[in-house]
């Protein structure tokens, strides 16, 4: 799709969407995004130039269909996949990618940590993906020295970062906000550092007694990113791993640094989004979103959940989707899904499906709550189909049509029941939607009440209830 678009840009010193937007150029990617988001091209260009919207689109990922992440666009959902040393292989990860895209993932992150040829897995995923692909390069940096922190040097990090750019990775989680002076702030936490990338860098700093190399070499990383239009996803190494640790001094100290790094990247015209928690009580979610907007000049916020309770292993796609919906309502731009296997094991294909649907629900609920134009159209169309007992239309409009049809057909599988004016819940005689009260019926009732001297009925609009 993008081969012709990017051919003229390759070799230029800066090919980022932000760079072109700041020059007043509407790229083909911006025009494409404007169309699918139903936004003016000028607004997309202005938001990208401002840093409030990103279009993750590496020039080497030519089969990508561009999409936008930002408060002006629809709330997006990311799905994580990836092989571990103990489970999965390259073919299975590509299948997970296809399943994730099928069920609505807007971006996919390859979090492979070992057990396979990481470059082979990554290039296979990128080659098969029409959605942006993100990675966490510190995983491969550590794997490249066989897990020996003491052998890992600054150039190893930058070498892997550029390799990912060359392969077509659209955004990379860069844990540059974790500083050596932040580490003592972890004292008193119940769960310490729960970011894998953050943990690697914390170990590196503790061993070498030196500052985080991703921080000290941040400008060098910016120089790499702008040559490929790779986007920063600034990692939150000190995100809370439980309710107890939410919004603590460690988390907020790193967030302040992430704001500084956001502005540094923008000086290079490099796109940025900022990652966020994690595990956060419901009453602290709004504070966390607003604080990120304040510290990071409204760069798109990308949160993992957050989980609103810690007592439901096996159901954390639910505990986190609750928090994700609220975070999206308050302005979070992208939600990173959580599967039922979170904290328990590597998710399989069915776990990916369950997590994604939970998060598509959360993102859609957030869009409705934020009154995005057209956000509720599909809901209204499904409701009309439900009222008309148009079962096939209901399935078609569902986030997961296969599951909706499967559940309906468990008890009423025959085709004749696709025209039935009931389901197995109420049966043929007790469905309340069979009670068709028309406007004409109500007009007639009003006339009767008026003739009897009763007060005129006053209609109440649904949105004012």
From Swiss-Prot:
**What cofactor does this chain's UniProt record say it requires?**
[4Fe-4S] cluster
Is Iron among the key words of this record?
Answer: yes
Query: GO molecular function, one example?
Result: carbon-carbon lyase activity
Q: Please name the InterPro entries in this protein's record.
A: ThiC (IPR037509), ThiC/Bza_core_dom (IPR038521), ThiC/BzaA/B (IPR002817)
Residues holding [4Fe-4S] cluster: 423, 426, 431
Entry EC no(s): 4.1.99.17
Q: Which GO cellular component terms, listed alphabetically, does the Swiss-Prot or TrEMBL entry include?
A: cytosol
Q: In which pathway does it act?
A: Cofactor biosynthesis; thiamine diphosphate biosynthesis
Q: Which residues hold Zn(2+)?
A: 279, 343
The organism sits in which domain of life? Bacteria
Decide whether keyword Iron is in the record: yes
Which positions bind substrate?
80, 109, 139, 175, 195-197, 236-239, 275, 302
Q: Which UniProt keywords apply?
A: 4Fe-4S, Iron, Iron-sulfur, Lyase, Metal-binding, S-adenosyl-L-methionine, Thiamine biosynthesis, Zinc
Main EC class of this protein?
Answer: lyase
Give me the comment on cofactor binding.
Binds 1 [4Fe-4S] cluster per subunit. The cluster is coordinated with 3 cysteines and an exchangeable S-adenosyl-L-methionine.
Q: What does this protein do?
A: Catalyzes the synthesis of the hydroxymethylpyrimidine phosphate (HMP-P) moiety of thiamine from aminoimidazole ribotide (AIR) in a radical S-adenosyl-L-methionine (SAM)-dependent reaction.
Similarity comment: Belongs to the ThiC family.
Q: Which PANTHER family match?
A: PHOSPHOMETHYLPYRIMIDINE SYNTHASE, CHLOROPLASTIC, THIAMINE BIOSYNTHESIS PROTEIN THIC
This protein is called what? Phosphomethylpyrimidine synthase
Q: Which organism is it from?
A: Synechococcus sp. (strain CC9311)
